[in-house]
Amino acid sequence: MSPSDRIPPGVWNAIDYERLAPQAMDAGRHAYVAGGCGWDATVAANRAAFAGWAVLPRLLRDVRAGHTRLQLAGMDLPHPLLLAPVAHQRLAHPDAEIATARAAQATGSCLVASTLSSCTLEDIAAASGPARWFQLYLQPEREHSLDLLRRAEAAGYRAIVLTLDASIQLASRGALQAGFAMPADCVSANLARYPQPAPAQPAAGESRIFQGAMRHAPRWDDLRWLLASTRLPVWIKGVLHPEDARELQAAGAAGLIVSNHGGRSLDGAPASLRMLPALRTAVGAGYPLLLDGGVRSGQDAFKALALGADAVLVGRLQVYALAVAGALGVAHMLQMLVEELHACMAQAGCARLSDITHDTLTPSC
């Protein structure tokens, strides 16, 4: 089905776009976007972690001067909701990342463009506002990674987001059952100029994981090289272990994104939200810490902020909104998330993001 580029009836909350997405996408494409790896245990865990907390309402609080403005990495943002890097957005809409970039600009959101985008990083930058970051997958050849860095710098991206948790992505059971295959028009536009090596073929007796997929996986020397190769701040995405957080902070990372890659890398990994308090303790107050994984509402964003995040990234929900209503849908989804966050803050007696602390939550069971 083709997207309508209008807001359909029945969208009352941001999460309604998830409900409507199967009507706007064919079954295979939807299964690819919605699924994680294995049995989707981590996908479910991300959502369940938010359900494990309830927001405590407060009475008689004056929030008439309330707002959600914040400073993040030198940017003045109107709200703490960013668009996460999501690959192959032409699966959802012919305008792909150009549409999400326009939505981010319209709502003042920071867009994080993916290395594996359907549109080039230059075209995405031209359609976006000044708040834009570039997500990087290190390439097998350093010269190609360096060229991506230089292109991002030249296109005005404000930061690099290095993803480290996706060297292995096992197939989605749902996508396999739906017979999904990547369409010919869903190429990784940024990588078109770089020759791609043939998949590693392990020798007899070797592992297709250890000696195959992990052959080009990033290591500490790659991170040190990257930090020395760009003038842009480098954020690290895919952090779940507190010791990794401490080591990355000490190495010079500008900030960390607590993430399990939406459950697409390791089925059985803990929910991002579950690990957030431990990572905040590990890096201390004041060090930038973001979260993605399972955010579907302004209440979810509130809970993440209360548990230690400075902001959250929205992944699948942006693709669902894109599929249903194009750029207008993504902008509408973001606006609804912001309004849901405003309502949650007001009910909890929080006039500023800094008022959202751990004691605004209570276990829900």
UniProtKB/Swiss-Prot annotation:
UniProt lists the family membership as follows: Belongs to the FMN-dependent alpha-hydroxy acid dehydrogenase family.
Q: By what name is this protein known?
A: L-lactate oxidase
Say what the protein does.
Catalyzes the oxidation of (S)-lactate (L-lactate) to pyruvate, with a reduction of O2 to H2O2. To a lesser extent is also able to use glycolate as substrate.
Q: List ligand-binding residues for pyruvate.
A: 32, 137, 261, 264
Q: What is its EC number?
A: 1.1.3.-, 1.1.3.15
Q: Which cofactor does it need?
A: FMN
Question: Which species does this protein come from?
Answer: Alicycliphilus denitrificans (strain DSM 14773 / CIP 107495 / K601)
InterPro entries from the UniProt entry: Aldolase_TIM, Alpha-hydoxy_acid_DH_FMN, FMN-dep_DH, FMN_HAD
Q: Where in the sequence is the active site?
A: 261
Gene3D superfamilies xrefs? Aldolase class I
Q: Name one GO molecular function term.
A: (S)-2-hydroxy-acid oxidase activity
Reaction(s) this enzyme catalyzes, per UniProt: (S)-lactate + O2 = pyruvate + H2O2; glycolate + O2 = glyoxylate + H2O2
EC top class named in words: oxidoreductase
Residues that bind FMN:
85-87, 114, 135, 163, 237, 259, 292-296, 316
**Keyword entries, A-Z:** Flavoprotein, FMN, Oxidoreductase
Q: Which SUPFAM superfamilies match?
A: FMN-linked oxidoreductases (SSF51395)
FMN hydroxy acid dehydrogenase domain mapped to chain residues:
6-365
Give the multimer and partner information: Homotetramer.
Alphabetized CDD domains for the sequence: alpha_hydroxyacid_oxid_FMN (cd02809)
Query: Cofactor comment in the record?
Result: Binds 1 FMN per subunit.
